[in-house]
């Protein structure tokens, strides 16, 4: 009897990942099961932590750092439908248009944006640490001949302080504990505490900061605004697999938890008063990726009174705009550290929203859109001719520089285009792939065939001069069985096209000398009957 492993079979479902991502996108647009609200410059976006953490290293660190890698508790008795609360995240350092494009990318695997908004999307992808979007935007900008903008130091500093503030608040909430016997951990809002006063030099301590929360009064669940139709549920296997695709990044976990572990002590009921105390610690210069400057933060502080205000309903026009965006889900997010997976992602097909043509390859959809808009951003500096693609401009510049990169291996001939070399190779190989459908003559080049069809050496004459001659030319009697065959006319092969071709050439050659001489019957029979057919024959008979 075989082992249990021998009885196992694997049934793949290739469309499952895209269908799962499509369902998550539909839930996001309807506001169902969303456990996070992102605010930026007065606009709000409902989304899921698991999807954001799977696509963005920044969000993964924001949701897990200091929380042991667990998902933030949402069972604190919020006022949203379904008895669940939703976290609120303020990201004023990312513009609404760029954030909307990145959220659409996270749920549809398609980055849809305009060429003018490409630098803003690149800046937002750098702040949120989305490697595949950064690589695609850099490739598009470099292909367009534009220089990628440098990261904004103020936004980088605000993003760093925002992340550190959440890590500090989460660590403190975990150490404060919860009384035994209480199953659900309290909801900790995602709104950060007021940032510490700016220091002359931005540093980060080598040791973790010592911070704690002081609680007063009732439970802090009222700090979380109401969210319509929000339900919480444990992560499914597919969502856990999607979150785990990014793996470990940079040493610090990218986390999604802001609640103490189950079974810990609960703080006393009352609004949370965040006070961070830092001890004397050894400091060193912060190690951060190149290009991320350090500057003083100008982010305004948020008081507890402002955080406790009621949430305004989402603008219906905004929901209609989000619903109208491209929704075709193809594949979930990929591991930015895996080059092979990133290469496969760059080859994912994208659909044109205008003509619905499937475009393959990253960065080719904006290039295809220029065919609809008529935009030609690449201009020749010599003659001023404009092109929609940069590679076409480079090929055009060879006409001015004299460069001929395609050389024949059999002779010294060089060519400007690859198809010219391909046609030239027929001369060496003897191949004649272009055949005339009238006279069956073959040619090595297509332009030779076109010249043959338009010239005087084929059955169908199409020159303008021939049409004028046809009007003034005398009408000769049509060919019949009694017409004598001109010299050199071969009718033995039985091809009607060849006969018509030879006959047309014969009439054309005899047009200058007059009509041909025809006989009414065979000369031998006429001589036997004694009926002269020509003046010379009559004179011969009279003399005889």
Swiss-Prot record:
GO terms for cellular component: nucleoplasm; nucleus. The modification Phosphoserine is found at residue 150. Keywords: Acetylation, Developmental protein, Differentiation, Disease variant, DNA-binding, Isopeptide bond, Metal-binding, Nucleus, Phosphoprotein, Repeat, Repressor, Transcription, Transcription regulation, Ubl conjugation, Zinc, Zinc-finger. Changing residue 339 to R: Slightly decreases acetylation levels. Slightly increases protein stability. Slightly decreases acetylation levels. Increases protein stability. Abolishes acetylation levels and ubiquitination and highly increases protein stability. The modification Phosphothreonine is found at residue 373. PROSITE patterns: BTB, ZINC_FINGER_C2H2_1, ZINC_FINGER_C2H2_2. Residues 348-404 are annotated as: Required for interaction with and acetylation by EP300. Its main location: nucleus. It is linked to Defects in Zbtb7b are the cause of helper deficient disease (HD) or helpless disease. HD and helpless mice are distinguished by the virtual absence of peripheral T-cells of the CD4(+)CD8(-) major histocompatibility complex (MHC) class II-restricted T-helper subset due to a specific block in thymic development. The developmental defect is selective for CD4(+)CD8(-) cells; the maturation of CD4(-)CD8(+) and gamma delta T-cells is normal indicating that lineage commitment is specifically perturbed without affecting positive selection. Transcription regulator that acts as a key regulator of lineage commitment of immature T-cell precursors. Exerts distinct biological functions in the mammary epithelial cells and T cells in a tissue-specific manner. Necessary and sufficient for commitment of CD4 lineage, while its absence causes CD8 commitment. Development of immature T-cell precursors (thymocytes) to either the CD4 helper or CD8 killer T-cell lineages correlates precisely with their T-cell receptor specificity for major histocompatibility complex class II or class I molecules, respectively. This is Zinc finger and BTB domain-containing protein 7B.
